[in-house]
Amino acid sequence: EQSGQRNMVAGLGAYRLSRSEGDWNLSDISDQITYVRKQGGKGCAFFRAGFVIGNEKGLYNELKNRFFKYPAQLPPLTWMSATHAAPCEPQEVHVTRERGGLRLRWEGSPDCLYTLYYAQADSIDLASARSILATGIRTNEWFLPINADAEREYTFCVTASNRYRIESRPSRSTYYYFSRYDK
């Protein structure tokens, strides 16, 4: 309530998992993450990073496999932007097949960061984190390695974000059917 419309993140003491610092159970941190999410928190910061990276009591694995399974965008900094205006949406994604995968290209401003969404279906649920293939892309292209033996359909679209992380509308969706046979 008192955040002034700024993003507040909870600081969680990953160091408390250490025997010398409290010997907490992994469930203590997991319960705190769940609580923060239920309260509408914008994220968590873990102190100290070495305990996360060092996988103390399996914390890194728990975060990667349970809580932060999919890429996520950083929240917008709307209070810093005078206009709150989103950048123009990028142009349609163009897909070309290359050895080992697909090359995705689009047109957009060089001042933006891009988020690439995809689905292995004919439509994309932009509200689902599962649909984010990559975020924070600094160029207008991406290479997606794929299994050349599997026939599969893909749908792609891209959004642009300005320096305040305000996201544009999505580009038009591009449908691509990958086949091991040339068509």
Predicted regions located by residue number:
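Substrate-binding cleft of secreted/luminal carbohydrate-active enzymes
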Residues: S3-S81
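Active-site proximal loops enriched in glycine and acidic residues that flank catalytic Cys/His/Asp
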Residues: L12-A14, A45-A49, W106-G108, Q120, ...
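Flexible, glycine-rich phosphate/dinucleotide-binding loops
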Residues: L17, I53, S123-D125, E167
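Pro/Thr/Ser/Gly-rich low-complexity, intrinsically disordered linker/stalk tracts
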Residues: E62-D111, Y164-K183
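Extracellular low-complexity, O-glycosylation-prone stalks/linkers
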Residues: D111-S131
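Short beta-strand segments within Ig-like beta-sandwich modules, predominantly Fibronectin type-III
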Residues: I132-T139
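Short strand-edge motifs at loop-to-beta-strand transitions and within beta-strands
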Residues: N140-L144
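Beta-strand-rich modules
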Residues: P145-S168
